[in-house]
């Protein structure tokens, strides 16, 4: 089971603000000699301390190098953490006729295949820690792809992984970039479990998984393994200047004094901040935040 302990450990942040320091946080300073980036986050890499990227507590010399984290304890295959039957129970209505993925696009085998490409995902720490990460991952991605509604059969939190593509009439999500140039006629709206969007995410994601997603972004909505890989890549990769979702949920990320003062503590809420904090956090009660928590509660109880 995904235990109640996992839930109590992780539901620590419901209304976090999106910044830690500087003008975005009322002049707050970073602890432990960390730099305050132009975006209001504390850290010690070039994204925080580099020329033109640091607003306060900036170094006079080269940016300090971050410490190299030691490998966390791990064990077992991802299949030992989440079984096929558990996967089906969690994503109970993903193949409903009203869902884009109704022909078993989001399959258990595709998930396992993709997950095994990312060392440490769902396999770091003890059994409770591994289950906590899987519950958090599926809760966040279920919110992004939900087809549920308040009176839906089996409740709104049984309808994750319904959609493949962003709903409505999304734009092209193209930001001019020399490193990740947009391909003619291609659009980089949300696709897949995490609804990856923007060329500056499709580009590095594709490079990491060995696929040209700048020229072929719709592979995220047509190839099940690539679709899952895009979500796990986002989960495992630091979203500068924020940490990775993975590092937060396994306890590797340590909050600064400013984080603690703003109630940004290790847990599920910080992950919401990483994924969509600019729109959902620091605004009091938000139905989207509550939806993410609702999925997490359900999965922790399975």
UniProtKB/Swiss-Prot annotation:
Q: Where is the composition biased (Pro residues)?
A: 61-72
Could you tell me what this protein is called? Endochitinase 4
Specify where it is mainly localized. Answer: other
Where found, per UniProt? Vacuole
Q: What is its EC number?
A: 3.2.1.14
Per the record, the GO terms for biological process are: cell wall macromolecule catabolic process; chitin catabolic process; defense response; polysaccharide catabolic process
Induction info reads: In response to infection, elicitor, ethylene, wounding.
Record's keyword annotation contains Methyltransferase: no
Q: Which organism is it from?
A: Solanum tuberosum
Similarity comment: Belongs to the glycosyl hydrolase 19 family. Chitinase class I subfamily.
**Entry keyword annotation includes Signal:** yes
Q: Disulfide connectivity?
A: 21-36, 30-42, 35-49, 54-58, 162-182
Q: Which UniProt keywords apply?
A: Carbohydrate metabolism, Chitin degradation, Chitin-binding, Disulfide bond, Glycosidase, Hydrolase, Plant defense, Polysaccharide degradation, Signal, Vacuole
